[in-house]
Amino acid sequence: MYKECFKIALGIEYNGSNYHGWQYQKFASSVQEKVELALSIIANHPVRVTCAGRTDAGVHSTGQVVHFCTSSIRNDQAWILGTNRYLPKDISVIWKRDVPMHFHARYSALSRRYRYILYNNSCRSSIFYQGLKFYHRILNVEKMNQAAQYLLGEHDFTTFRSSHCQSKTPFRKILYVNVFCINCLIIIDIVANSFLYHMVRNIVGCLIEIGISKKKVTWIRDILKFKNRTSSTKIVESNGLYLVQVQYSSLFKLPICPVGPFFV
């Protein structure tokens, strides 16, 4: 007997510290694996999800979006609370929406927003060590923000691209970038149509060099033009990086959630 198939979108929050990234791994634990296992129990059939952005090992999210198809009819409480019951404590479904069949978590996205959070203090934090990048030297936030503005617009971001990046084009368009501080936290807030592999973490590494006055503010503009990864600096750790928002057309009527993480 034929059963009608529905498409559902979910908002997913997770602490990526214990996972080898979002994407399913044959010999390592992934966020995708845990989400699919939990949803399959609720749906009573195997579920495969597609995400908006495949985060790396150790990267967190407060705004991941996924979609999946199902013929099972469940209420919102079952899809959210029921799924969470079978998820580990460091992964949560935070919202659910029915979406049209042409919706695609990745290809329907208009932009992605990441935040990298530095804990700029003389002593590290034992409470938030998994979710913050500790940096003990004093950083000049104003210089970092000035430098970041050179990245606005569409550019060839080869300089900030991993050598393992599989994207067919190095061109990306940064729509917004801001570096600001809240007490001991320095937040690098960046929005783009999409990102290259390791792009945000490589950018942050360069901004730190400028923040400690090792490099001039205009250095980031110059190395962007070089289009050479070796002209940049070393990549920063993944533990300070968060996928915080994915933007879609208002026609899909997805919820507008506060930009995380909650302690910012």
Curated annotation (Swiss-Prot):
Report the EC code(s) recorded for this entry: 5.4.99.12
- Give the annotated active site: D56
What this chain does, per the entry, is described as: Formation of pseudouridine at positions 38, 39 and 40 in the anticodon stem and loop of transfer RNAs.
Q: This chain belongs to which protein, by name?
A: tRNA pseudouridine synthase A
Cross-referenced SUPFAM superfamilies: Pseudouridine synthase
Per the UniProt entry, what is one GO biological process?
A: tRNA pseudouridine synthesis
Top-level class of the enzyme under EC nomenclature:
isomerase
Where do the annotations place substrate binding? Answer: Y114
Chain's gene name: truA
- Alphabetized UniProt keyword annotations: Isomerase, tRNA processing
**Gene3D superfamilies cross-referenced by the UniProt entry:** Pseudouridine synthase I, catalytic domain, C-terminal subdomain (3.30.70.660), Pseudouridine synthase I, catalytic domain, N-terminal subdomain (3.30.70.580)
The similarity comment for this entry is: Belongs to the tRNA pseudouridine synthase TruA family.
Summarize the subunit comment.
Answer: Homodimer.
Q: Which InterPro entries match?
A: PsdUridine_synth_cat_dom_sf, PsdUridine_synth_TruA, PsdUridine_synth_TruA_a/b_dom, PsdUridine_synth_TruA_C, TruA/RsuA/RluB/E/F_N
From the UniProt record, list the reaction(s) this protein catalyses. Answer: uridine(38/39/40) in tRNA = pseudouridine(38/39/40) in tRNA
Q: Which NCBIfam families match?
A: hisT_truA
Q: Which GO terms describe its molecular function?
A: RNA binding; tRNA pseudouridine(38-40) synthase activity
